[in-house]
UniProtKB/Swiss-Prot annotation:
It holds the Pfam family COesterase. Residues 1-18 form the signal peptide. Expressed in lung, kidney and liver. This is Carboxylesterase 1C. The active site is at residues 221, 342, 455. It is an enzyme of class 3 (hydrolase). The modification Phosphoserine is found at residue 473. The gene is Ces1c. Keywords: Disulfide bond, Endoplasmic reticulum, Glycoprotein, Hydrolase, Phosphoprotein, Serine esterase, Signal. It comes from Mus musculus.
Length: 554
């Protein structure tokens, strides 16, 4: 019996595929963390996975509506093998988003908590050596109100491209954005959490096989917007070295355009908090339970009130357009892109409550433009001209619907991306643009057959979903391998090009870009006509100022 036990004990430390069977344990500045090894078919080196590693103290009590603080140290080996809870958010939408964009084979268990400042790490490195691999830090999307790190499995990207992948979480909704406009609650807690995670990466990622001097931040939708905020923020200096914004940038958003006093009067009424002073209101809101704040958040949605990133003089010293014009930002190489049909299916599905009878026609388009006109930086007087420009006398209802959805895709994603890319180029930044146009098989049964390149579709290919999920075609698998190679080459070198790949031109005065899909090819002047139309229209019709808007606060 003792011999049997001895044999098994010896096997437990016997190197197999270059690794012992013992799970990985890594030192961090707070203490040791225990992970797990996961092997991917075709790769000798397993990936070391660490889930739910804390990068800040739980933002509870007095730390609600306050800057994140470093995590408390621990003296034991912390188990980092389970997914962390997502930050506080609407559970129904959290499940929809998680199930829709997850690159996992299995449906993730849904856990939500205000204690949520954790990150996940996927490292293909031999942790017994100093590997100095490129690091890619993912910032999830979800409108800054829903989402989490764990649906995005970094296993395939990490193994195939030999990079360390980190997925981070940050406070959302009222927890991540509430601002009084003064020192009592300046706001931008979501972005301060993102910055805290990046500082943690600088201090710790070398022990996980990563190179802290080669960090790429990348994100989609509001994650892409967050990437651009961090690029424009002086607080981002030296925390990252390359950036990728997928389907979202900070240009033409509602950043800094909210009248804080008007919004907070509504929050005060909903919460029954005394708003006679900022300090009293913040203190009152800190006493509310998580469920009470969730209820308040739900009512804000009913009132069509959205909180936003603020021009606080710290995270963002000025309006994004001013920072870009002054060229006073982190001039790191940058990939900017969006998808062919950003409003193809998922976003209209999420806006069903705003669509009368689910129809998309001139009346609905006008309604939505009026609903979002302050966020879009347009005046209501412009709306008829905008609709006429896109419809151009078309009578067929199906074609009208398609053109209107294209219009919203341009307004929210395409035109801001081009404007940012031009500003980056003019500042001397190495810039690359793409348009993604492909229909993943994973969602083919959920959406109309005509939708190709919907919002978020590129995520499946960036994270190697065809290599993780069952049923992918050879074309999908090859497309994913190509996209991962582009993204990882950029993370390694600041240039996506490499051997065996279609050439991706740098975005210069010729405005060359890459169309990525079943056929991947170069093209020029992405959305040039649409940008020219909007630029001319805005010059003739400056946005109106109304009681619910203002330019900035300091």
């Amino acid at each position: 019996m003792w011999l049997h036990a001895l044999v098994w004990a010896s096997l437990a430390v016997c190197p197999i595929l270059g690794h012992s069977l013992l799970p990985p344990v890594v030192d961090t500045t707070q203490g040791k963390v225990l992970g797990k090894y996961i092997s991917l078919e075709g790769f000798e080196q397993p990936v070391a996975v660490f889930l739910g590693v804390p990068f800040a103290k739980p933002p509870l009590g007095s730390l609600r509506f306050a800057p994140p603080q470093p995590a408390e140290p621990w003296s034991f080996v912390k188990n980092a093998t389970s997914y962390p809870p997502m930050c506080s958010q609407d559970a129904g939408w959290a499940k929809i988003l998680s199930d829709m964009f997850s690159t996992e084979k299995e449906i993730l268990p849904l856990k939500i908590s205000e204690d949520c400042l954790y990150l996940n790490i996927y490292s293909p490195a031999d942790l017994t050596k100093s590997s100095q691999l490129p690091v890619m830090v993912w910032i999830h999307g979800g409108g800054l109100v829903i989402g989490g790190a764990s649906p995005y499995n970094g296993l395939a990207l990490s193994a195939h491209e030999n990079v360390v992948v980190v997925t981070i979480q940050y406070r959302l909704g009222i927890w991540g954005l509430f601002s009084t406009g003064d020192e009592h609650s300046p706001g931008n807690w979501a972005h301060l959490d993102q910055l805290a995670a990046l500082r943690w990466v600088q201090d710790n990622i070398a022990n996980f096989g990563g190179n802290p001097d080669s960090v790429t931040i990348f994100g989609e939708s509001s994650g892409g917007i967050s990437v651009s905020v961090l690029v424009l923020s002086p607080l981002g200096k030296d925390l990252f070295h390359r950036a990728i914004s997928e389907s979202g940038v900070v240009i033409n958003t509602n950043v800094g355009k909210k009248n804080i006093q008007a919004v907070n009067e509504i929050i005060a009424t909903l919460s029954q908090c005394n708003d006679t002073s900022s300090a009293a209101m913040v203190q009152c809101l800190r006493q509310k339970t998580e469920s009470e704040l969730l209820e308040i958040s739900g009512k804000l949605v009913q009132y069509n009130i959205s909180l936003s990133t603020m021009i606080d003089g710290v995270v963002l010293p000025k309006a994004p357009e001013e920072i870009l014009a002054e060229k006073s930002f982190n001039t790191v190489p940058y990939i900017v892109g969006f998808n062919k049909q950003e409003f193809g299916w998922i976003i209209p599905m999420m806006l069903q409550n705003l669509l009368p009878e689910g129809k998309m026609n001139e009346e609905t388009a006008s309604l939505l433009l009026r609903r979002f006109h302050s966020e879009l930086n347009i005046s209501e007087s412009m709306i008829p001209a905008v609709i006429e420009q896109y419809l151009r006398g078309v009578d067929d209802p199906a074609k009208k619907s398609e053109l209107i959805l294209d219009m919203f895709g341009d307004i929210f994603f395409g035109i801001p991306a081009v404007l940012l890319s031009r500003s980056l180029r003019d500042a001397g930044v190495s810039t690359y643009m793409y348009e993604f146009r492909y229909r993943p098989s994973f969602v083919s049964d959920k959406r109309p057959q005509t939708v190709e390149g919907d919002h978020g579709d590129e995520i499946f290919f960036v994270f190697g979903a065809p290599l993780l999920k069952e049923g992918a075609s050879e074309e999908e698998t090859n497309l994913s391998k190509m996209v991962m190679k582009f993204w990882a080459n950029f993370a390694r070198n600041g240039n996506p090009n490499g051997e065996g790949l279609p050439h991706w031109p740098e975005y210069d005065e010729q405005e060359g870009y890459l169309q990525i899909g079943a056929t991947t090819q170069q093209a020029q002047r992405l959305k040039a006509e649409e940008v020219a139309f909007w630029t001319e229209l805005l010059a003739k019709n400056p946005p109106e100022t109304d009681p619910t808007e203002h330019t900035e606060h300091k």
